[in-house]
Amino acid sequence: MRILLPLALWLSSSCAFAACPPAGRDRASLQALKAAKFAMPDAIARNVLAEGLLDCLADPDPSLRDGIAYEAFGAWMRAGTFDADELRTLRDGLYARLDGDDPGGFRKPFAALVLSEVARTDRVAPWMRAGERAGMVERAATFLESVRDYRGYENGVGWRHGIAHGADWAMQLALNPALDRAQLERLLTAVASQAWPPTATPTCSAKANASRGRCCPWRSVA
């Protein structure tokens, strides 16, 4: 409970999202943490930082959004750092970031990407109740169906690619043996809705196509 308090207080406070880097941190300290593979023995300090890094998912600087925030969450979750209550708190904070306007187009796709890591933790070592898992399936499907910003890579700000990140989330859920047929079909329907979306714009710049040969980088499934 003591460890969860900083996150719980934040979730119950203002809906406005804070700036990035988080309070008490700067780019140099975050890069140093990355070099240390995001190791933080102090669970309270780690959870306070996790709270702040949620806001970095909306930052237009890819070195903060993708290189620090996403990588930190991925490292912590793949190492089994968070317990079930902490994962619930993180999940709910990410859900909040799927709501409302997203003028920059980064917050929602990167919240979905980190939610794919949350879904993976439940696939590897189940902790969600059936109702929670069903709720996440619906959240993921709704997110995928809602994407209308088809921008991919943009020089200076990096990747958005909401469809790819939503697909990562759907994939981790679909790989979970706890899902039933109806839930799998719900995800399939959501994916199919984007196979030929109502409106679309090019997702990659010419430079990105030339340098990478594809629109979206592959994310780890394991």
Predicted regions and their residues:
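Solvent-exposed, charged interface segments at domain starts and junctions
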Residues: 7, 30-31, 166
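Eukaryotic acidic, Ser/Thr-rich intrinsically disordered low-complexity regions
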Residues: 26-35
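N-terminal signal peptide c-region/cleavage motif recognized by signal peptidases
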Residues: 11-15
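Alpha-helical solenoid scaffolds in large eukaryotic transport, assembly, and signaling factors
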Residues: 34-141
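Cleaved targeting-peptide boundary
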Residues: 18-25
